[in-house]
Design a protein with these regions (language model features):
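Carboxylate-rich, polar loop motifs that coordinate divalent cations or form catalytic acidic clusters
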Residues: 1-253
Length: 253
């Protein structure tokens, strides 16, 4: 839901559904809507993985083919090609813009990119691109699905297969959040990460939710605790101590 009360919904194959003047109490069928695809907009792909607000006059859009942005001034989507290490950066599943004009991108297959945002408030230009990978850049090791803002831990990145990484400014690279070896390897298949008010990280995996406080203090919640299903796709904060979880078999509150 953006500043104009337009509800943007990205789909995996059918582009973007825009619902105008959205209100929770309204029936969606009563709202004016529009579908944006590669055939009627500047989208690079109809598989749209993330839509994020910006401090500038635009929205960031990550899709199968890379990065796009929606210009509020021009009322249209534009593709923003990213080339690094002689290849185009694609499969963008999460985007995080910092207060000091840095943009972080998480890719499922190509690692993480950090860039400085230049240009104008209406038309960004990405500069000083740096790419961060694990295991020598091997494609299957660099499935990064999510970015979470930490405090002293800096940014956290969820990896499907290798757990949670954090960015270390000193070494200018990614390092594992924990050296703990879980007995069930599915706990290293991380999709969402969110922080609660007690400074715990709620880490969604394919084997439940890890409530992580520190290297030696964490709890696991999954189907054994009454969850409908242990595969967690998303975590949404409802209030300070109330969260919604989406699973393969429905929602959990």
């Amino acid at each position: 839901l953006d500043k104009e009360r337009t509800f943007w919904i990205g789909t995996k194959g059918n582009g973007i559904l825009k619902i105008f003047d959205y209100e929770v109490q309204k029936n969606i069928s009563d709202c004016r809507s529009e579908i944006l695809t590669t055939s009627n907009s500047g989208l690079g792909s109809n598989a749209v993985y993330c839509i994020r607000e910006s401090n500038r006059n635009l929205l960031w859009i990550g899709d199968e083919e890379g990065l796009n942005f929606y210009s509020y001034r021009e009322r249209r989507i534009k593709k923003l090609p990213l080339w690094i290490d002689n290849e185009e950066f694609k499969y963008i599943h999460d985007i995080y813009e910092t207060e000091d004009s840095e943009l972080w991108l998480a890719s499922v297959g190509m690692g993480v990119v950090r860039a400085r945002i230049g240009g104008t408030p209406d038309h960004p230009v990405l500069e000083k691109l740096q790419r961060y990978v694990v295991n020598g850049g091997e494609f299957g090791s660099n499935y990064f699905f999510t970015i979470c803002k930490g405090d002293s831990l800096n940014l956290l990145f969820g990896n499907m297969g290798y757990g949670v990484y954090r960015f270390n400014e000193t070494i200018n690279g990614l390092e594992p959040l924990t050296t703990h070896k879980y007995e069930n390897m599915n706990l290293n298949k991380v999709v969402p990460i969110i922080k609660d008010d007690a400074d715990n990280y709620l880490i969604g995996t394919t084997y439940g939710v890890i409530k992580y406080a520190s290297e030696n203090s964490y709890q696991l919640f999954n189907a054994k605790d009454g969850f409908l299903n242990s595969t967690i796709h998303a975590i949404l904060r409802h209030s300070s101590d109330n969260f919604w979880l989406s699973t393969n078999q429905g929602l959990i509150n």
